[in-house]
Amino acid sequence: MKLCDFEVGLDKPFFLIAGTCVIESEQMAIDTAGTLKEITGALGIPFIYKSSFDKANRSSDASFRGLGMEEGLRILSEVRRQVGVPVLTDIHEIDEIKPVAEVVDVLQTPAFLCRQTDFIRACAQSGKPVNIKKGQFLAPHDMKNVIDKARHAARDAGLPEDNFMACERGASFGYNNLVSDMRSLAIMRETGAPVVFDATHSVQLPGGQGTSSGGQREFVPVLARAAIAVGVAGVFMETHPDPACAKSDGPNAVPLRRMKDLLSVLKELDALTKRSGFLENQFD
């Protein structure tokens, strides 16, 4: 699959989607994107900057949702222009798709909306690559139906059918908890779409702090290493200069100062995994 200006797949080095959970300010977005560009450039990791203009699924109505679509898109446009990196953001409503697609390089669908057929079809017909997150409630093999919906919609619109990624972000495991079943990464390959592992939302404790979600960021490196060992096309991670002060999802964000060390390890593991091949393909 061609994504932005690079090829992605199990025969290519992993790419990174990373940034702050929500856009907090223009300066933070530019600084964070710049730091990540420097790190990934030195390591040779293809990079897409990610941040949200609206967090529509916050636990509490009192929580910070974001700067809104107009201001958020302006800031993402500035990140793209000043830092020179492709940008990704998520959309929550069909009406948001057209204006957002005019600014960003990649769209992302929230996990909660993966079964909304009209929404998935509309995103697929935007002409942009789409990172489709698997719902916490969905079996990994059910993602084939979701990806097929997107492909059929693209075909109906005369657009490429290979513009979609399947993203794993953990599965509900009782109340206020998620678990990552690493088998799902191999199972989701059956969709034919590049598989992305969301290493930070996978350690989230949804609603675990009462009016906000908790998280266990110390397990991000653990799960990220495991996913790379299984074999994925890309890794998604949210990061923040000061997670304790983040306005959204701070408990599961990677401290920005730790990203270089983590990505260095993942790069080495990725090369080993893909050089060794995938023996599971011969276990039929």
Curated annotation (Swiss-Prot):
It is an enzyme of class 2 (transferase). The keyword Transcription does not apply. Keywords: Cytoplasm, Lipopolysaccharide biosynthesis, Transferase. It is found in: Cytoplasm. It catalyses: D-arabinose 5-phosphate + phosphoenolpyruvate + H2O = 3-deoxy-alpha-D-manno-2-octulosonate-8-phosphate + phosphate. Its EC number is 2.5.1.55. GO terms for biological process: keto-3-deoxy-D-manno-octulosonic acid biosynthetic process. GO terms for molecular function: 3-deoxy-8-phosphooctulonate synthase activity. SUPFAM superfamilies: Aldolase. It comes from the Bacteria. This is 2-dehydro-3-deoxyphosphooctonate aldolase. Its main location: cytoplasm. The keyword Cytoplasm applies. Belongs to the KdsA family. GO terms for cellular component: cytoplasm. Pathway: Carbohydrate biosynthesis; 3-deoxy-D-manno-octulosonate biosynthesis; 3-deoxy-D-manno-octulosonate from D-ribulose 5-phosphate: step 2/3; Bacterial outer membrane biogenesis; lipopolysaccharide biosynthesis.
